[in-house]
């Protein structure tokens, strides 16, 4: 006796279910391939404790690194309220307390589970270098206070230290070249090392020091000015030097102190300041000038007296006064020498000028790569404006307003006569605050170097299918389910009959 139509349908559905189910298993098990899951994101925190203020930066990078160095990007920046940590000599604990608000903001961004593995570092620069020279005990107390605050936070605290000027310059060089894609760039779906080309030099003007860093055309003859790096599998040799006491704030204080000493010797009162606008007048405490080891005093000078200063708005004499703060004669006749007897190869390639280089020229609207003649003309004309006109023209900017003339002329003296840029090489300088969305400074370069010391995590392997195989598997799974449900329905109706 043959099978009934119900039996034939039932058997057919079971056959379809078995065939499609077997096909689905083959697709899942046999056609699967090994794939890498996206790497976990790691975070790092760096405090830049400068002479005038402190900033916090949060960086992030994939856990699996490219050629032993993390592919780092900036995730957060936070400027801490108050002065630089070197100002807290009378109450060092406040230096640590000042960091808390920005640290809390950083921890809110980073997943809580990753707080204990987030490397955190505080680097102090020229302000603390000067304090260490003046009073090493006070400098140690401040570093101890900030270390205590950060070590109590839930992060992996790597330490707080005074950064050497050479490191500050070299890490700034790394930052610029990394952000501009000179060290590593993304192309055709992967990170690759770019061909050897035009690496960019770094010009940094802080409050207490200035740094120049670049790769010269020839060999670096003075090994004390050479720093070597290995980043993303490539080696780099960079010339770098830091000039302490030649930062913006210190040079302006040194200039005022020199004018005050000259006034004392000539018995002329008040001090006539050629870099201040005509009509400007102020009474300044003389003692504040001599807090820094950058300024050498004379026994005959009474530090308790006040100083009356009058501006004359004379850019020519301002340049003469600024030049007197350099020792150019020590490099006379030497091709590879900047000033103060310091070795420097001839500048080569493109340069990014940042920090106070940028802030000063941004105020003067000189960041659009104007010619040297235009820059000179603009700065001189600004210096010759009467103080009352300057005040009216720039409301709400009183804090730094009197100093932009001196700062602009100082930058020209430093770059042209100090670092030996010329009218031909001037167009190679770009005045920038950021490259892309990243602030230019030493902190990113430090974090890139630091990630070379942080162990990489092995990428996680999973079994997966291509999209077409996955789609086919879903179709056969649905077909199997429909066949089984159909067979079950037939069985139920069959039993009822």
From Swiss-Prot:
UniProt tissue specificity: Expressed in liver, jejunum and kidney.
Domain of life: Eukaryota
Glycosylation sites: 306, 365
MF GO annotations: apyrase activity; ATP binding; metal ion binding; nucleoside diphosphate phosphatase activity; ribonucleoside triphosphate phosphatase activity
Any single biological process term in GO: nucleoside diphosphate biosynthetic process
Locations listed in the record: Cell membrane
Keyword Ribosomal protein tagged: no
UniProt keyword annotations, A-Z: ATP-binding, Calcium, Cell membrane, Disulfide bond, Glycoprotein, Hydrolase, Magnesium, Membrane, Metal-binding, Nucleotide-binding, Transmembrane, Transmembrane helix
PTM description: N-glycosylated.
Class in the EC hierarchy, top level: hydrolase
Keyword DNA-binding appears in the UniProt entry: no
Segments on the Extracellular side according to the record's topology features: 30-473
Positions of disulphide bridges: 78-102, 245-294, 331-337, 383-405
Entry domain remark: The transmembranous domains are involved in regulation of enzyme activity.
Entry protein name: Ectonucleoside triphosphate diphosphohydrolase 8
Origin species: Mus musculus
Gene assigned in the entry: Entpd8
């Amino acid at each position: 006796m043959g099978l009934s139509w119900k039996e034939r349908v039932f058997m057919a559905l079971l056959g379809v279910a078995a065939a499609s189910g077997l096909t689905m298993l083959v697709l899942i098990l046999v056609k699967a391939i090994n794939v890498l899951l996206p790497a976990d994101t790691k975070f790092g925190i760096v405090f830049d404790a400068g002479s005038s203020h402190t900033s916090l930066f949060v960086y992030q990078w994939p856990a699996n690194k490219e050629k032993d160095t993390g592919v780092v990007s900036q995730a957060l920046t936070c400027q801490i309220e108050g002065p630089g940590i070197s100002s807290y000599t009378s109450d060092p604990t406040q230096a640590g307390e000042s960091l808390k608000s920005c640290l809390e903001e950083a921890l809110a961004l980073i997943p809580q589970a990753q707080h204990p593995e987030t490397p955190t570092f505080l680097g102090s620069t020229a302000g603390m270098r000067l304090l260490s020279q003046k009073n090493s005990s006070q400098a140690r107390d401040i570093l101890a206070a900030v270390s205590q605050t950060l070590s109590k936070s839930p992060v992996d605290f790597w330490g707080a230290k005074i950064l050497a000027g050479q490191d500050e310059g070299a890490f700034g060089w790394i930052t610029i070249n990394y952000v501009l894609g000179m060290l590593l760039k993304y192309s055709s779906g992967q990170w690759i090392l770019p061909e050897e080309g035009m690496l960019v030099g770094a010009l940094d003007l802080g409050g207490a020091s200035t740094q120049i860093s670049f790769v010269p055309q020839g060999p670096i003859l003075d090994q004390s000015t050479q720093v070597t790096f290995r980043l993303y599998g490539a080696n780099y040799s960079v010339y770098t030097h830091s000039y302490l006491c030649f930062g913006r704030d210190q040079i302006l204080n040194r200039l005022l102190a020199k004018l005050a000493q000259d006034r004392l010797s000539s018995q002329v009162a008040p001090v006539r300041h050629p870099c201040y606008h005509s009509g400007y007048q102020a009474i300044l405490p003389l003692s504040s000038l001599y807090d820094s080891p950058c300024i050498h005093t004379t026994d005959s000078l009474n530090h308790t007296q006040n100083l009356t200063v009058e501006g004359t708005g004379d850019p020519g004499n301002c340049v003469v006064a600024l030049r007197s703060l350099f020792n150019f004669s020590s490099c006379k006749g030497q091709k590879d020498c900047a000033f103060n007897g310091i070795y420097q190869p001839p500048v080569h390639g493109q340069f990014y000028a940042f920090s106070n280089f940028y802030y000063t020229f941004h105020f003067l609207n000189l960041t659009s790569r104007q010619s040297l003649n235009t820059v000179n003309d603009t700065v001189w004309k600004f210096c010759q404006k009467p103080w009352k006109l300057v005040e009216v023209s720039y409301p709400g900017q009183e804090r730094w307003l009197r100093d932009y003339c001196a700062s602009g002329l100082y930058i020209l003296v430093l770059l042209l006569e100090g670092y030996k840029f010329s009218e031909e090489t001037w167009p190679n300088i770009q005045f920038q605050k950021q490259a892309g969305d990243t602030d230019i400074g030493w902190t990113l370069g430090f974090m890139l170097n630091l990630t070379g010391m942080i162990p990489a995590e092995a990428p996680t392997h999973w079994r997966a299918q291509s999209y077409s195989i996955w789609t086919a598997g879903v179709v056969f799974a649905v077909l199997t389910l429909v066949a089984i449900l159909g067979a079950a329905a037939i069985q139920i109706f069959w039993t009822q009959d």
